[in-house]
Amino acid sequence: MLFSRIIAASAQRKLSVYLKKGGLVAYPTESCYGLGCLPTLAKALGKLAHLKKRPQHKGMIVIGNQLEQLQPLLQMPSENIQTMLRNEWPAPKTFLLLAKSGVLPALRGKRRSKLAVRVPDHTGARRLCQALGMPLVSTSCNRAGKRACRTEREVRRQFGRDVWIVGGRIGRQKSPSQIIDGETGKRLR
């Protein structure tokens, strides 16, 4: 299904219902396909970690179409940090910011207080979040130890019918997004 079609009302409703039931979605991002789910559903986060064979102590990245869509998951950053984020995004830059206390440990990582968030530099990924009206988890679409999927065909080969696939082209970014501590400015990846 192409991004232009996902915005059609019927497809949008179907995908939204699917995600609210704990479904997983694969979609193009800056450097590869992303694999995601709703960031507020423990069942979906567990399913995603299991499918990827990913250790559950690792945190996950959440993407949104703009900062305001991510704010319900975050403690309100200072005005300076908000200004910096608005100037930096959209970009292949993920920032670690203080998470609200109700954010699931499976999302932020066990014993961690910060959440990794990004407004991607991929129009389709932003439009997907905008069309759904909610942020999405965004991990690389691959099983642990395997290369990240770069095409719809590769997603089908690795995951079959376990995920809803949003077709489209990935961006031109060659490497994963940078990860930066939003408070200290320290680059972690």
Curated annotation (Swiss-Prot):
Position of the signal peptide = none
Q: Which reaction does this chain catalyze?
A: L-threonine + hydrogencarbonate + ATP = L-threonylcarbamoyladenylate + diphosphate + H2O
GO function term, MF aspect, one: L-threonylcarbamoyladenylate synthase
Keyword list (alphabetical) reads: ATP-binding, Cytoplasm, Nucleotide-binding, Nucleotidyltransferase, Transferase, tRNA processing
EC numbers listed for it are 2.7.7.87
Q: Where in the cell is it found?
A: Cytoplasm
Record-annotated disulphide pairs: none
User: InterPro entries from the entry?
Assistant: DHBP_synth_RibB-like_a/b_dom, Sua5-like_dom, TC-AMP_synthase, TC-AMP_synthase_SUA5
Span-the-membrane segments of this chain are none
Q: Name one GO biological process term.
A: tRNA threonylcarbamoyladenosine modification
**What cellular component terms from Gene Ontology apply here?**
cytoplasm
Chief location category: cytoplasm
Q: Where is the YrdC-like domain?
A: 9-189
- Specify one Pfam family: Sua5_yciO_yrdC
* Group of enzyme by EC: transferase
| Family statement drawn from the similarity comment of this UniProt entry | Belongs to the SUA5 family. TsaC subfamily.
Task: Say what the protein does.
Answer: Required for the formation of a threonylcarbamoyl group on adenosine at position 37 (t(6)A37) in tRNAs that read codons beginning with adenine. Catalyzes the conversion of L-threonine, HCO(3)(-)/CO(2) and ATP to give threonylcarbamoyl-AMP (TC-AMP) as the acyladenylate intermediate, with the release of diphosphate.
Q: Which PANTHER family match?
A: SUA5 (PTHR17490), THREONYLCARBAMOYL-AMP SYNTHASE (PTHR17490:SF18)
Name this polypeptide is given: Threonylcarbamoyl-AMP synthase
Question: What gene is it encoded by?
Answer: tsaC
